[in-house]
Amino acid sequence: YFVGANFWYGAILGSEGEGGNRERLHKELDFLKSIGINNLRVLVGADGENGIKTRVEPSLQVAPGVYNDTILAGLDYFMNELRERDMTAVLYLNNSWEWSGGYSVYLQWSGHGDAVVPAVDGWPAYMEYVKQFPQSDSAKALFANHVNYIVSRTNRYNQIKYVDDPTIMSWQIGNEPRAFSDENKEPFARWMADVAAQIKSLDPNHMVSSSSEGSWGCEMDMS
């Protein structure tokens, strides 16, 4: 059986750069293991430039296809530490919410104007902005490139390909993915299916989950 917990900052703690603290990582993993937690849900990494007060940093993907190698190393290190403790991970790749970039950063990168920051501009403005994502082919294409890059990588500490690593319990498409409008429900469902198929084409060995909030994730339409 699995007993899980959220541990979004695992890749950052595993880094030897800004934000990294491997001693703390070891202590936290040892403690979690000691109380029976054996599965951690982890953010692969944040998207977008650093310096946005409401966003996790340091960022992993600082520009489209441009990666902070210290965070990639942190992710690899974190995964290897889980492996040594016989623990597993659920790795999520995107985010509906601004705290790690996600939808809003992909929209900004693909020419939809500056990303809206809810702490500054308000939540209604944010949700109006990010509802463009499910119908933006250019934003979705940038995310597809990110999926290819992450899923296809090899861990530098143990030379195990991610697709072959039993430490991964599941990939998740994103954190709490939402359509953000009724008219987006069908495009959103198609996008989710496309991403799941993309991941499975790269990695037939692991589960793919949505991380949906259920009714909130489908505009209260569970049909």
Labelled PLM ranges:
Residues 1-223:
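Active-site mouth of glycoside hydrolases
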